[in-house]
């Protein structure tokens, strides 16, 4: 009994903590979010909309609060996105669990949820629930993502095979990302700066390697300059090292560089040996030999057109002197990260001075376009024009701001965007296997058949495009065979308004007063629990009697993989109708992956779609724990768009948006979004799994024990008594 009470108490305590964190971050969510002012114990003032920075700035005493923030930080280090959504989603999940165990009614839960709640309270423990959450993540979530949500995905690539970034799609993605992290007066400028940076750094064959390099060395690739307006931020071709030249000699023509990780000046003896001097003459002779050897090495470097010496260690004065004599510039004391970045760009190994000097050619050299000092706000930097041997074209970002704190916020936002794009460029293997039993090879477990027939797009002839959908089929559990099927969609055709009503999956529906969501007859088809939805939303709908006119707002799709090429500023649209491919005979197994570059329009589309399909899955489940977990997660997902639309009224409010989305899904019509921008599906998926893992940790806490400790006394070692 004590263990059960302690476990229930942990959920209640976690809910109280999460609600406090939710109150902090929810006010700065979305484009309408405000900035939060925090005062750190050091007296430093933080004004930010960045959820990760706000959570890390808090002084937390409760152990569960610290654990939640640690989970958020771990998630951000990997994905760079979703700190505020993490807290909101976790809070709604805890509310759902707490409501079930306390037999509290939730207006968004189905009628038989109390029956399942009593079953769980009598027969289950919290650790069993945590195991059910993990089972949901590994066996149910991935299947729903692959079987259902994948049909709605758009791609950020203009070419599916080469994975070439589409600039307009990247602009929409970055603008939506920075909208919630940077002030309103700067987010568009920072978004455009980031977009320009990538297209200047990437070649036509660039891939995920560029994002990995920029993410790993973002600190070395950006320079912060205080005392200037944000608008002075710019991109500089080449690499800017935050060091000054130890020795600078202007040079033109053929320039080469070497990298050294040890001193060039020879030592008296090698490691592990002993050098004995018996007289001053021997000492002077040894010094003369070292000087001549150093002089010969530097002269030989000059003969090989080496004009730049990059060193990770401090070089002796003798090396600097002979470098200047031979016209060689020296940059020393570089960090290991800076040296690693240069080596990754030019593919150069460090130069090791030979023990026995020879006049042979030095192999470890690289060409340099230019080498000159750069002055930014009275501070000198080293500006290098490196010739890249990889897909990354060296460019540096100069971030300006009136104060250092604002520059740090922009740096964090840019670095987070890099992590988000790095994850977006990866394929995601979905961890589920589903058996196919029907004649068409579709899974009887995950496939939900709508009452209406699937709409088949008319063939536009040569203008049609295709989206590859990668699947792997394992027949008889032995051989794996990769197959590729295609979903045909329209090309970027200009369709008159009269024809838009015919091409339903690719046009925005026009709603007249006869088909608005004001009558009970229409509301009855909007949800699985139609009576509940009618009662819940009818008072809200009566306040608005105008029809919704959304004619002419659409996403035009072109190229080979559902690339978003043009989205009007008034709205955007998702294609929803498709037909699952024929995957072979029965008793075969299907394993799939989510391709890189999958995106969805912003505005809660991912959460509403997953909510809708989870409710459909829960309705067909036969196991109570799967039904309960699906219902809790489905209802918690709606908490995110609720916060996004809390400032909207009328037809743009959350109830109207939700009802329109459900109606569109049930009638095979496109989903219409009132907001512009794109968001990463990979980031949303990783956020969902990270929150479920955090919730699992919370549910395994049996007891929270508070231990009060007195502050330790600090003794001054240099007190007067000791002196």
Swiss-Prot record:
Effect of residue 255 to I: Found in a patient with Bardet-Biedl syndrome; uncertain significance; the patient is homozygous for a mutation in BBS2
Consequence of substituting residue 677 to V: In BBS10; has moderately reduced ability to interact with BBS7 and BBS9
Subcellular locations according to the entry: Cell projection, Cilium
A GO molecular-function descriptor: RNA polymerase II-specific DNA-binding transcription factor binding
Any Pfam family matching the protein: Cpn60_TCP1
GO biological process: chaperone-mediated protein complex assembly; cone retinal bipolar cell differentiation; negative regulation of neuron apoptotic process; neuronal action potential; non-motile cilium assembly; photoreceptor cell maintenance; protein localization; regulation of protein-containing complex assembly
GO cellular component annotations of the record: cilium
Domain of life the protein comes from: Eukaryota
Listed InterPro entries: BBS10 (IPR042619), Cpn60/GroEL/TCP-1 (IPR002423), GroEL-like_apical_dom_sf (IPR027409), GROEL-like_equatorial_sf (IPR027413), TCP-1-like_intermed_sf (IPR027410)
Gene3D superfamilies the record matches: GroEL, GroEL-like equatorial domain, TCP-1-like chaperonin intermediate domain
Keywords, alphabetical: ATP-binding, Bardet-Biedl syndrome, Cell projection, Chaperone, Ciliopathy, Disease variant, Intellectual disability, Nucleotide-binding, Obesity, Sensory transduction, Vision
Outcome following mutation: residue 613 to H: In BBS10; has moderately reduced ability to interact with BBS7 and BBS9
Alphabetized SUPFAM superfamilies for the sequence: GroEL equatorial domain-like
Stated consequence of mutating residue 240 to G: In BBS10; has moderately reduced ability to interact with BBS7 and BBS9; severely reduces the interaction with BBS12; 8% of wild-type
Family: Belongs to the TCP-1 chaperonin family.
Disease (UniProt): Bardet-Biedl syndrome 10: A syndrome characterized by usually severe pigmentary retinopathy, early-onset obesity, polydactyly, hypogenitalism, renal malformation and intellectual disability. Secondary features include diabetes mellitus, hypertension and congenital heart disease. Bardet-Biedl syndrome inheritance is autosomal recessive, but three mutated alleles (two at one locus, and a third at a second locus) may be required for clinical manifestation of some forms of the disease.
Protein function: Probable molecular chaperone that assists the folding of proteins upon ATP hydrolysis. Plays a role in the assembly of BBSome, a complex involved in ciliogenesis regulating transports vesicles to the cilia. Involved in adipogenic differentiation.
UniProt miscellaneous comment: Adipocytes derived from BBS-patients' dermal fibroblasts in culture exhibit higher propensity for fat accumulation when compared to controls. This strongly suggests that a peripheral primary dysfunction of adipogenesis participates in the pathogenesis of obesity in BBS.
Protein name: BBSome complex assembly protein BBS10
Species: Homo sapiens (Human)
